[in-house]
Amino acid sequence: AAQADVTSMIRTNCIVKEDDMSSINKNKYLSLTEKSFYKKLGKVTKIVGLTIESVGPDAKLNDLCRIYSADNSQELYAEVVGFNDSNVLLMPYDVVDGIGPGSVVENMERPLSVKVGDGILGHTLDGLGNPTDGSELEYTDEYPVEAAPPDPMDREIISKVLPLGVKAVDGLLTVGKGQRIGIFAGSGVGKSTLLGMFARNTKADINVIALIGERGREVREFVERDLGPEGMARSVLVVATSDKPALIRNKAAKTATAIAEYFRDQGKDVLLMMDSLTRFSMAQREIGLASGEPPVTRGYPPSVYSEMPKLLERAGMSDKGSITGLYTVLVDGDDFNEPITDTARSILDGHIVLSRKLGQKNHYPAIDVLQSISRCMSQIVDKKHKQMAGRMKNVMATYNEAEDLINIGAYKSGSNRNIDYAIYKIDAVNKFLMQQTDEKFDFEDEVTQLSDIFADYEAFENGSLQLKK
């Protein structure tokens, strides 16, 4: 009688016809429907490109669904990404294999979540938060991958320095706990190496690192060469390589953010590093176009420009802890005004620009200090530190303006005291800005080195300093 009622319910709701029952495992199908006689299942009707279209089930945007292959040998998880009239548009988390018209779709009636806890430290996870080595990890809670940012009025004001152990950043572009900084650079200028230095040298309690759309060979290189055992011990790595489906690459960024949110809620100071925000946006472009969104600027659909602030605003201060966000942005063709770069720069609390020209001079890290800014620095450092940083930037700007004249021998020493002082100090400035990847400095030592360079500045101002010819 129960089986007859279920079959009647299925036929009445036009989900799976009685004569289609031979194409699936009836026992499996009945076990799904016995949970609730009124739960509608869906049926796949079309697969085009990245999307699967189905009639039913009842679902909401971002709901997690499970799709069963026709012979019931495989299960595929997918997410609701849109609707076509009354039909449901799904995007799979894995390669579509064995799924075809008539495959059953079950709504899990919950969004994607990630398991969290201290047991995930030191491990590498995939885009959905599963350990890549198949090991069983100890979890204490689950956090939703999609979450709202903290209420603006609940955020603590950024007031404390987060030392990152890189002199050029700590000295001239000081980052505060809860700040969000973009690292803007073209390809091959040293973004990943700089992230590795931050991860090893930072004073943050926890590192959460997301590698989005990276080459497969670079993942192990980053773990063993850039991060090292010291950095990995207090880190969680979330990896979605370039061959993964767009939805996985998109979710990996949000999974890493959810993990960082968990540790922030435990009162920790978290450093969230994402490489790269550009590839997250590219994944969202694939999802948006596959869902039928129109392309606008440079082929990016509107959802790209709405998803980016949703992701970035989740970082920052809360009333419990902090997430300091470092997001690399791959600058297309070294054009710093292209849409993704421009949008990210407008949302973030500052940016660090890496210069290909400096890299070609073997000046690493290749940070162009004069093109970079930390919008929170003036609020978190003392007056003397701010003054010394300003003097160094002034020396660099003065030297850059006169560099061509100096190089061709057209500048006559003594004709401009500011240029003379810049020439006198430029070697010390460059030495301060350059740093080996295995070098580590305390914040107090960095500030002391910065002050020592300009210990004679007052003598220069009053004219008593004798500059070397």
In which residue ranges do the predicted regions lie?
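P-loop NTPase catalytic core
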Residues: 171-172, 178-469
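N-terminal accessory targeting/assembly segments
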Residues: 18-123, 127-132
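Low-acidity, Ser/Thr- and Arg-rich intrinsically disordered low-complexity segments
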Residues: 8-11
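Active-site phosphate-binding and catalytic loops of NTP-dependent enzymes
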Residues: 32, 74-77, 112-116, 131-137, ...
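Short, glycine/charged-enriched hinge/interface segments at domain edges or termini
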Residues: 96-194, 199
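Phosphate-interacting basic helix/loop segments used at nucleotide- and nucleic-acid interfaces
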Residues: 24-29, 108, 164-169, 256, ...
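Flexible glycine-/small-residue-rich
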Residues: 46-48, 56, 69, 82, ...
